[in-house]
């Protein structure tokens, strides 16, 4: 099959939810979980120049009362944020920011993170009729259902009948 034949048969699928799906109070239980391993933590910590020994030196972490190495909190945040993308913002629209980020409990190498988000507000964009502005409250949990991180994030979210280009 030639490339042009292949392209002519391709079907474009819409990804993610749209603004009309974002009703205040709606809760998304994000279906993926992610176990954080030592390599994830070490790579993230060194690649972001975050050289706090709590994140890569077990004897140091233990000297401060921790059982083992802590996971870098920014990796926790980014992982939980990432778990929410498929449901909340994969459909397209610029990221507008994060507010009220709280790291609630420590996360350790080997912990599995899950996420849940609730629509806090949704309103039409005054400047771009193809989008709405949505804010969610996202919570991250460990494998024991203990909340470890919480934040609000805001995105422009494409309307169902909007043009495909941003």
Where are these regions (language model features)?
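Hot-dog-fold acyl-thioester-processing enzymes
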Residues: 2-98, 149, 160-166
């Amino acid at each position: 099959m030639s490339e042009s034949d292949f392209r002519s048969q391709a079907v474009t699928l819409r990804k993610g939810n749209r603004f009309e799906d974002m009703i205040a109070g709606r809760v998304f239980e994000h279906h993926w979980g992610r176990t954080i391993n030592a390599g994830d933590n070490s790579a993230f910590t060194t690649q972001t120049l975050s050289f706090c020994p709590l994140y890569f030196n077990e004897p140091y972490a233990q000297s401060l009362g921790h059982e083992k190495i802590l996971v870098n909190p920014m990796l926790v945040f980014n992982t939980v944020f990432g778990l929410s993308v498929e449901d909340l913002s994969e459909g397209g629209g610029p990221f507008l920011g994060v507010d009220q980020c709280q790291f609630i409990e420590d996360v350790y190498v080997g912990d599995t993170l899950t996420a849940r988000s609730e629509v806090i507000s949704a309103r039409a964009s005054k400047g771009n009729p193809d989008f709405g502005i949505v804010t969610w409250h996202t919570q991250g949990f460990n494998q024991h259902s203990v909340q470890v991180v919480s934040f609000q994030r805001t995105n422009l979210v494409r309307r169902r009948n909007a043009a495909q280009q941003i």
